[in-house]
């Protein structure tokens, strides 16, 4: 996959200025990819957003209940997706333990988390400055 190279971001309006005086109520951002694609995202402490949607040449791909522990539903241009019920955290912890025991890399290394933190920091910097921010490698 590709990592984003730059981001712009905007803080949404605050409908409860007391509750959200020290934190954003909502935030939208646009990640620029090296090939020119733009990824638009939104997060909110107020709105109930629990879905993921991607628009591509061959149609729309989406997940509902995307961030729950179970109950995800997905649709593609070819029909519904079928998800087995799994405990994601248990599978990841078991894989970490096996990777250490078997002296092999894990598919989700710490570098991915560090990359994600850099992207999140760039999103907040873009929101605070109102400017396009390059994402450090």
What positions do the PLM features span?
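Short polybasic amphipathic segments
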Residues: 52, 67-77
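A generic structural motif
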Residues: 32-34, 55, 72
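Short, mixed charged/polar active-site loops
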Residues: 36-38, 49, 60, 78-80, ...
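Short, surface-exposed beta-strand-loop junctions and turns on beta-sheet-rich folds
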Residues: 46-48, 60-61, 69-70
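C-terminal helix-rich "cap/oligomerization" subdomain common to oxidoreductases
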Residues: 34, 98-137
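Active-site loop of classical SDR/Rossmann-like NAD(P)-dependent oxidoreductases
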Residues: 82-94
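Hydrophobic alpha-helical segments typical of transmembrane helices
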Residues: 3, 92-95, 100
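Rossmann-like dinucleotide-binding domain that binds NAD(P)(H)
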Residues: 1-38, 43-49, 111
């Amino acid at each position: 996959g590709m990592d984003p190279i730059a981001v712009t971001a905007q803080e949404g309006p605050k409908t409860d200025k007391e509750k959200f005086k020290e934190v954003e109520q909502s935030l939208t951002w646009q990640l620029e990819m090296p090939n020119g694609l733009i990824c638009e995202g939104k997060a909110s402490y107020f709105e109930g957003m629990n879905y993921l949607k991607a628009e591509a040449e061959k149609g729309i791909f989406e997940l509902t209940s995307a961030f729950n522990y179970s109950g995800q539903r997905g649709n593609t241009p070819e029909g519904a997706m079928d998800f087995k019920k799994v405990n994601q955290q248990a599978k990841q912890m078991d894989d970490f333990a096996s990777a250490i025991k078997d002296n092999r890399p894990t598919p989700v290394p710490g570098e991915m988390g560090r990359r994600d933190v850099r992207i999140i920091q760039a999103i907040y910097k873009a929101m605070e400055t109102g400017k396009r921010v390059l994402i450090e490698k």
